[in-house]
Amino acid sequence: MAQLETRTEPMVVNFGPHHPSMHGVLRLVVTLDGENVIDCEPVIGYLHRGMEKIAENRTNVMYVPYVSRMDYAAGMFYEAIVVNAPERLANIPVPKRASYIRVLMLELNRIANHLLWLGPFLADVGAQTPFFYIFREREMIYDLWEAATGQRLINNNFFRIGGVACDLPYGWLEKCIDFCDWFGPKIDEYEKLITNNPIFRKRIEGLGTIQRDQAINWSLSGPMLRASGVSWDLRKVDSYECYDDFDWQIASEKEGDCYARYRVRVEEMRQSLSIIRQACKMIPGGPTENLEAQRMATEDKKSEIFGIDYQYVAKKVAPTFKIPNGELYTRLESGKGEIGVFIQGNNEVTPWRFKIRAADLNNLQILPHILKGAKIADIMAILGSIDVIMGSVDR
C-alpha cells in the first residue's frame, strides 16, 4: 500500500505593528514551516520623527527636552549624552557635585528601565504577577524624579551643559537611601518568585542563544553583549562622569540565552543600588541642606566649600552658546547598551551634523538570525529579551 506523503508550504504571518505583545510599533514578517520559523524580516520606521534633523535645526540648549521622548524608559540617558557631546567638544568642565547628581539620576533610570523590561517580559512568557509588582517600585523612582526635576516619567529636562538644572532639594538624599533600603529586599523577592521557578526556566532556557563571537560581530551592547560572556561596560571602559569613584562589578553571564539576559539585568539592578548608596554618601558637600549650612557658617569666600566642585553647574550656558568647530563621538552605557552621539560643529548655535546611535537598533538587527529554527510561540519571548523601545529605534 502506497504511503501518503505530507507536504507543507511556507506560510507568511505578520506580527504587528499592532500586537498585544509587540514592544512598540514593530512589524515582523515571519515565514513559517508548520510551527518552525524559517525566516523573519523586521519592518521598522513607523515611529520615525526625524530627531536628528530636529537637532540640526535647534540650539543645543533647546534640544534637551526633545530627547527623552525617543526612549521613554531611558530619558535621562539621552539627556546626558546630548549635553556630553558639546561639553567635550567645547572643553566645558563639570563640577564633581554635578557629576555625582548625574550618576544618581542615571542609575535610578537604569533600575527603572530594567523594571519596565522585567514586567512585560514576564507577562509575555505567561507570568502575570510580577507585572504588577514592578510598578510599585517604579512609582518610588518617579517620586524621587518629581522631587528633583519636577517631572515624573519623561521630559525631565534636568541635564545642562556643564552640570544640572538645579541642586537636589532638601531631604532628597535621605529619601533616596530609604528607597535603596526598600528596593534591595524586593529584588530578593523577585528572585525567589522568578529565578529558580521551574516553569519559567523551562520556558526560556536555551532560547535565542547568541555566542560570544556573534555578539561581538553584530555590534551588540549592554545586557545582550554581557549575557554572552563579554564583560564590557562603558562605565568601566570609558570611566565617564565619576564612576571610577565607586566600587561595583560588571554583571555578566556566559550562556547567551534569554535566561542569561534576565540574570544580567537583575544583577545590574543590584549593582546600580550599590552605586546609588555610595554616591549618596560620597557626594561633595553632602545633602543640600548641610552644604548650605556650611556655606553660611564660613566667612572666607575663598574656602573650598565655595569652589567649583561643590556647585551643581560650572557656568550657566547662554542660549546663544555656539558649538565650536570640530567633530567627535561620545558614548555612554544606558540600560539597553551603548548610546552615542556624533556631533560636528561649525561655530554656530546649531550643530552641522548630529548623529544618534541607539543601542536597541543595533541589538534588534540580530533578531532574524536568532529566530531561525525557533518555534512561533517563542518569538515574543526572544524579542522581549532584547528590550527594544521603538521610539529610539526609529528616532
Curated annotation (Swiss-Prot):
Subcellular location: Cellular thylakoid membrane
SUPFAM superfamilies given in the database record: HydB/Nqo4-like (SSF56762)
Membrane topology designation: Peripheral membrane protein
Presence of keyword NADP: yes
One GO process term, biological-process aspect: photosynthesis, light reaction
Pfam families given in the database record: Complex1_49kDa (PF00346)
Main localization of the protein described in the UniProt heading: membrane
Domain of life (superkingdom): Bacteria
SUBUNIT field: NDH-1 can be composed of about 15 different subunits; different subcomplexes with different compositions have been identified which probably have different functions.
Family annotation (HAMAP family): NDH1_NuoD
Function noted in UniProt: NDH-1 shuttles electrons from an unknown electron donor, via FMN and iron-sulfur (Fe-S) centers, to quinones in the respiratory and/or the photosynthetic chain. The immediate electron acceptor for the enzyme in this species is believed to be plastoquinone. Couples the redox reaction to proton translocation, and thus conserves the redox energy in a proton gradient. Cyanobacterial NDH-1 also plays a role in inorganic carbon-concentration.
Similarity comment: Belongs to the complex I 49 kDa subunit family.
Name listed for the protein in its UniProt record: NAD(P)H-quinone oxidoreductase subunit H
Gene transcribed to yield this protein: ndhH
